[in-house]
């Protein structure tokens, strides 16, 4: 005859095995889903300033401000296994001193149940766009890309890049502006 503890242990082990099998089934049903979506990006304003750099030996560095529009339909990205999306807009460019520079300019957490159709107008960069030198001034190829990290209830965390990118030229001169 089995004791009460032995029966409880068997029940717990069986329940754990069933839950693991169900979780694996959940992961397999959504693991290979295409989570990409078309994205439209438009930059409406670029401001470039020369500011004091207190982080290093350089006296001044470039600071860029960008105002942009984002339009994307992320409805097909959501399914029953997606808890939220972490969206972020990044800028990628090259300079003489660095072959690849990447800076996150803006981010947003989009929860399940919120409107997955983005139509954002005149959004200002949320984070500073610093370059450690003067790599932004006159740079003709700063590429903005909207990407997102899918946060599932169970499974892997896929990183998805939107299909729309925009390359913008930065001005050849600095502006003196009090507000942006």
Curated annotation (Swiss-Prot):
Task: Note the topology in the membrane.
Answer: Single-pass type II membrane protein
Q: Which residues lie on this side of the membrane: Lumenal?
A: 33-180
Q: Please state where this protein is localized.
A: Endoplasmic reticulum membrane
State the tissue distribution.
Strongly expressed in epididymal white and brown adipose tissue with low levels in heart.
Q: Which residue stretches are annotated as topological domain Cytoplasmic? A: 1-11
Q: Which residues cross the membrane?
A: 12-32
Please list the residues annotated as glycosylated: 141
**How far does the signal peptide extend, from start to end residue?**
none
| GO terms classed as biological process | fat cell differentiation; signal peptide processing
InterPro entries assigned = SPC3 (IPR007653)
Arranged from A to Z, the UniProt key words for this protein are: Endoplasmic reticulum, Glycoprotein, Membrane, Signal-anchor, Transmembrane, Transmembrane helix
Recorded GO CC terms: endoplasmic reticulum; signal peptidase complex
- SS bond partners: none
Induction record = By the PPARG agonist rosiglitazone.
Q: What is the similarity comment for this entry?
A: Belongs to the SPCS3 family.
Q: What else is known?
A: Arxes1 and Arxes2 appear to have arisen by retrotransposition of the signal peptidase Spcs3 followed by a segmental duplication event.
- Please give the function described in this protein's UniProt entry: Plays a role in adipogenesis.
- In Swiss-Prot or TrEMBL terms, this protein is called Adipocyte-related X-chromosome expressed sequence 1
Organism expressing this protein natively: Mus musculus (Mouse)
Whichever gene encodes this chain, its name is: Arxes1
């Amino acid at each position: 005859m089995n004791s009460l503890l032995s029966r409880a242990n068997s029940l717990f082990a069986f329940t754990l095995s069933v839950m693991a099998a169900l979780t694996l089934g959940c992961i397999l049903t959504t693991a290979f889903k295409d989570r990409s979506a078309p994205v439209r990006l438009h930059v409406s304003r670029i401001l470039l300033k020369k500011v004091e750099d207190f982080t290093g030996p350089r006296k001044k560095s470039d600071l860029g401000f960008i105002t942009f529009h984002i339009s994307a339909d992320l409805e097909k990205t959501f399914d029953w296994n997606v808890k939220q999306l972490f969206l972020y807009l990044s800028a990628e460019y090259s300079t003489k001193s660095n072959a690849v520079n990447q800076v996150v300019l803006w981010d947003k957490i989009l929860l399940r149940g919120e409107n997955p159709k983005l139509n954002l107008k005149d959004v200002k960069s949320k984070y500073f766009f610093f370059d450690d030198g003067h790599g932004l001034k006159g740079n003709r190829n700063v590429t903005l890309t909207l990407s997102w990290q899918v946060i599932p209830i169970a499974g892997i965390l896929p990183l998805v890049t939107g299909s729309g990118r925009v390359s913008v030229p930065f001005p050849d001169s600095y502006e003196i502006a009090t507000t942006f």
